[in-house]
Amino acid sequence: MPHQQILMLFGLLPVATNISTWWNFGSMLLACLTLQLLTGFFLAVHYTANINLAFSSIIHITRDVPYGWMMQNLHAIGASMFFICIYIHIARGLYYGSYLNKETWLSGTTLLIMLMATAFFGYVLPWGQMSFWAATVITNLLTAIPYLGSTMTTWLWGGFAINDPTLTRFFALHFILPFGIISLSSLHILLLHEEGSSNPLGTNSDIDKIPFHPYQTYKDMLMLTIMTIMLLTIVSFFPDIFNDPDNFSKANPLVTPQHIKPEWYFLFTYGILRSIPNKLGGALALTMSIMMLLTLPFTHTSKLRSMMFRPLMQLTFWTFTATFLVISWTATKPVEPPFTTISQVAALMYFLFFISNPIMGWLENKIMKL
């Protein structure tokens, strides 16, 4: 296909006239992925995956490599931006019923799992105190699996404790997974354009559409500019805002940090894990906190797609959002009353959202006589 025809095809891509700013986060995620790949490549060039040299190599990157500090900060804060965008992207999908486009939703949830795995492996690489202990706590959860747990943990560690082989394979996984994310993102976009984007009203968009260019391209560029300004402001003025003070010390297996906690974007899953006083139960709850998203296309009972005209479901959704924030907050606190009770109630409410979704839909149908 000639170059002009491809451009024309892209320019004439029909898009619903009424899609709001919440639909811009997909293109922002693509920008985040590109940024992470570029900065990640330049960091990998200078990084050494060895337990004796990893921490020193990060210091070398920030001090000696030209613009290394910028690459490192862009990569670390870019990951936070990535998760901010993906959580908003998922929230929009929940609110406006985008999950009814099953294939797109299921591929997107798989992308989220891959992204979380990549971020976890990346957090271990600097080999600071919190990196080491976060890796120890999370990989230890595999031992909760009956029969196979211990074997799987030893296999993942490459020995009987977290050591040099663990760091090497985590670096390899952190390097290879983004290529899987690129492939799956392409599939995600392909599946989306089979049916086309939904819109805030949840109606069929075919009756009123406009060309993608110039309307949506300018809208995308505006949001990307805002995100870039935010990113560069944080990198320039508050580069350590998301960092844990413990991670500025080299990993020491003999000294346990007073309070082990992951990066902010994993706090809600960690909070759910900690709220259950049983290892296997906690590991299952942690897994289910993400896997429950896969059930949404199959439990939608309402005759209306979007929550725009569903006040009961709106109340449920915003309660769910508040619950997400409360769990994240309690996960930063020590395991003692009242935080344990708050996190247990919040974890229960988190899962109740997925149970109440079909019930609320059925109830609204009855009330509105649909």
Curated annotation (Swiss-Prot):
It holds the Pfam family Cytochrome_B. Heme 1 (or BL or b562) is low-potential and absorbs at about 562 nm, and heme 2 (or BH or b566) is high-potential and absorbs at about 566 nm. Its cofactor is heme b. The cytochrome bc1 complex contains 3 respiratory subunits (MT-CYB, CYC1 and UQCRFS1), 2 core proteins (UQCRC1 and UQCRC2) and probably 6 low-molecular weight proteins. A ubiquinone binds at H193. Keywords: Electron transport, Heme, Iron, Membrane, Metal-binding, Mitochondrion, Mitochondrion inner membrane, Respiratory chain, Transmembrane, Transmembrane helix, Transport, Ubiquinone. GO terms for molecular function: metal ion binding; ubiquinol-cytochrome-c reductase activity. Heme b b566 binds at H89, H188. This is Cytochrome b. It is found in: Mitochondrion inner membrane. It is a multi-pass membrane protein. Heme b b562 binds at H75, H174. Signal peptide: none annotated. It comes from Chilabothrus strigilatus strigilatus. The keyword Iron applies. Component of the ubiquinol-cytochrome c reductase complex (complex III or cytochrome b-c1 complex) that is part of the mitochondrial respiratory chain. The b-c1 complex mediates electron transfer from ubiquinol to cytochrome c. Contributes to the generation of a proton gradient across the mitochondrial membrane that is then used for ATP synthesis. It comes from the Eukaryota. Binds 2 heme b groups non-covalently. PROSITE patterns: CYTB_CTER (PS51003), CYTB_NTER (PS51002). The chain crosses the membrane at residues 25-45, 69-90, 105-125, 170-190, 218-238, 280-300, 312-332, 339-358. GO terms for cellular component: mitochondrial inner membrane; respiratory chain complex III.
